[in-house]
Amino acid sequence: MASSTPSSSATSSNAGADPNTTNLRPTTYDTWCGVAHGCTRKLGLKICGFLQRTNSLEEKSRLVSAFKERQSSKNLLSCENSDRDGRFRRTETDFSNLFARDLLPAKNGEEQTVQFLLEVVDILLNYVRKTFDRSTKVLDFHHPHQLLEGMEGFNLELSDHPESLEQILVDCRDTLKYGVRTGHPRFFNQLSTGLDIIGLAGEWLTSTANTNMFTYEIAPVFVLMEQITLKKMREIVGWSSKDGDGIFSPGGAISNMYSIMAARYKFFPEVKTKGMAAVPKLVLFTSEHSHYSIKKAGAALGFGTDNVILIKCNERGKIIPADLEAKILEAKQKGYVPLYVNATAGTTVYGAFDPIQEIADICEKYNLWLHVDAAWGGGLLMSRKHRHKLSGIERANSVTWNPHKMMGVLLQCSAILVKEKGILQGCNQMCAGYLFQPDKQYDVSYDTGDKAIQCGRHVDIFKFWLMWKAKGTVGFENQINKCLELAEYLYAKIKNREEFEMVFDGEPEHTNVCFWYIPQSLRGIPDSPERREKLHRVAPKIKALMMESGTTMVGYQPQGDKANFFRMVISNPAATQSDIDFLIEEIERLGQDL
């Protein structure tokens, strides 16, 4: 057999390595151990035990020295248990004859529980390690019918009878195997990417606590964390630290819905009891490039999508203030009552920032509620270099800000911030007596759940709070600046190349870089309907080839009458210039013969 392929650590530093290669001949004990742990648990443990027994003293000495130099997270990936608490050493356990009923709180279930969770942690750590290894695929793509039919012992169907813990461990491993590694440095498909280790630890602890956010009574620490963090976010927006309110919601779409509910309640509080029949014909305004959640909220809240009026944008995707004012006047002339304007700070496709100052002037002139949807762009408020792009946000009545996007907090983590205290409570509270008793022994103003439209509410704050503690505001600033610099690097690399064409002129405001790849067959051909039709098919074909090969992922879409183009977004702090270079080369490789 030929000499062994480089280890994963070597290949990860080699930008030219084939991402589909597999290390077939590990040359050291620890790499063999990694292979063993990829086997079915019973077999893997036997192999690992054999390796430990047969390893030479010299090799063991080398390994112990090497392990001490590793980070603690990597220590956990090895099988060197000499320094661990004896209660948490892995033993050879036959999970094929164990079931969920054998775990805690079962009598004498502690040992089985420890061994099972150690196996789960091993699966998770192996996944984390591979996520940051560029020789690992971003995804192992299969069509829906293939996964539904079952893959090598991985079956999605539910059974009437319990399955063994061995099968459960296989299911855990294969669920990750057939998913998408959204934390991979070459995953650019969505606005939410990355795998922050501190955030991951926070999410694990959150699930272990398994509590609810509706009262201080059952989530005292988390409720206080949320209040402190929301106050800090409001201060960064530019509001007074004494006033204001906010809450974490399941996502930006719900945060935007909160803003419309708050605006409606502010001007027409009777709507809470009497409904939409008691108020005038209200209309909302948002840009034609804004997130679809504004129209969705209009439908859900009884305004109707016809009463969500779209404002024209310029070629960069920014609201044209003159068109906003003209449409407000037109609506008033038709007997409608303008209520609310949504300005976007970081549009989904172009990454555009609406001119908030000019929009705020119009809202003040006509007494309208101004909301800023900064779900994507809010993170730039953390950067002294880039926060000017949101100039005027302090004049807004409400702001949506998603830390799970640009700030890299694990999903889900979205905040709705409101400038005026008390509106969320007044709008949503129902005073359920079994939760929100007024005569508790503590200050019940900390029972924040009644200002939410939900009852049960997931703890989204801890991972974010923990990341902020670990990074500091400066750490988030550096992370965001780096992502913006990578977008500038990509733009500079492709803007003058004949095989690429920019969707709009000028440097990107955000990390969104929008471009067409022009295959050889379409270069030098004048614009025409036929050329646009052919170009429209290029991005989907390249994306399909990307997914089949699993090397990288980047999104595409049309916009208005424009043919499908690639929308590159960067929010993963693990990405580097070499990953941008790889993306460019991969698009060229996959698209050159189209």
Swiss-Prot record:
Region span, Disordered: 1-23
Keywords, ordered alphabetically: Decarboxylase, Lyase, Neurotransmitter biosynthesis, Phosphoprotein, Pyridoxal phosphate
Low complexity compositional bias, start-end: 1-13
Gene3D superfamilies documented for this protein: 3.90.1150.170, Type I PLP-dependent aspartate aminotransferase-like (Major domain)
GO biological process, one term: gamma-aminobutyric acid biosynthetic process
Catalytic activity reported: L-glutamate + H(+) = 4-aminobutanoate + CO2
Positions of post-translational Phosphoserine modification: 78
GO molecular function terms listed in the Swiss-Prot or TrEMBL record: glutamate decarboxylase activity; identical protein binding; pyridoxal phosphate binding
Residue numbers bearing the N6-(pyridoxal phosphate)lysine modification: 405
GO cellular component: cytoplasm; presynaptic active zone
UniProt similarity note: Belongs to the group II decarboxylase family.
Quaternary structure annotation from Swiss-Prot or TrEMBL: Homodimer.
Name by which UniProt lists this protein: Glutamate decarboxylase 1
Organism: Felis catus (Cat)
Gene: GAD1
